[in-house]
Amino acid sequence: MSVISMKQLLEAGVHFGHQTRRWNPKMAPYIFTERNGIYIIDLQKTVRKAEEAYNFIKEVSTEGKDILFVGTKKQAQDAIKDEAIRSSMHFVNNRWLGGMLTNFSTIKKRIRRLSEIETMQEDGTFEVLPKKEVIKLKGELEKLEKNLGGIKNLDCDNIGAMFVVDPRKEKNAISEAKILGIPVVAIVDTNCDPEEVDYVIPGNDDAIRAVKLITAKMADAIMEGRQGEELAE
C-alpha cells in the first residue's frame, strides 16, 4: 500500500498546477494534462515520488540524522512549523537568513543571544530593568524567535536532509544545502525546476491543504524511522 493515496491527493487539490504560461518545461514529465489554462499534475507520479521521498526521509531518520523543514511562504508557514515540532525536528518558516547553514557560526551567535534574552525573561531580570529597556529586549526577542526559533537546537553537522516547500521561493536555502552536500526533498509545482531537487514530489505548493498533507507525510516518515515501526493511518 502506498504511503499516500490518490484520493487524499485529489481531496487536497495536489493536482492543480500553475497557469500554463507560468511553467517550467522541465516539469513536462510530471504534467498529466491542461485544463482551463492550468496544468494538471499527474498524481500517479506524485504517489510514486512521495513514496520514494518517504522512504528516503525514513532512512535518514533511522540513521539518527536530522531533517530541516523549510517553507517561508504564507501557505506553508503553519504546516512547516507544526509538522517539524510534531516530529521533533528543526524548521525555518519566516525568513531564510543568508548563511543560515554555510555561515552557521555567525547564526549561532544570534541563537546564543536569543537564549540569553529568554533566560532574562524567565529569571526575573525583566522585572528589575527599566521599562524602556524591557520593551526593547522584547522586540529583539520576538524578531530572533521568528527567524531562529525553529533552529535553536540545530546541529548543522547532523542534518541528513532538507524538506522544502517551493524550491523557487527557497532557492537560497537549496543552494546552501548543495554547498554542504545535504540532499533536498521538495514539493515541486509546475513553475519550478525539478533538477534543483534530489527528491521531487510533484504537487501544488500554493494550497494550504496540499502542503499540509505532504508535509505531514514527511513528518510521519521521520517518526517511523525513529520508532522503527509503521504508523497507523
UniProtKB/Swiss-Prot annotation:
The keyword Coiled coil does not apply. GO terms for cellular component: cytosolic small ribosomal subunit. The keyword Ribonucleoprotein applies. Gene3D superfamilies: Glucose-6-phosphate isomerase like protein, domain 1, Helix hairpin bin. This is Small ribosomal subunit protein uS2. The gene is rpsB. It holds the Pfam family Ribosomal_S2. Transmembrane segments: none annotated.
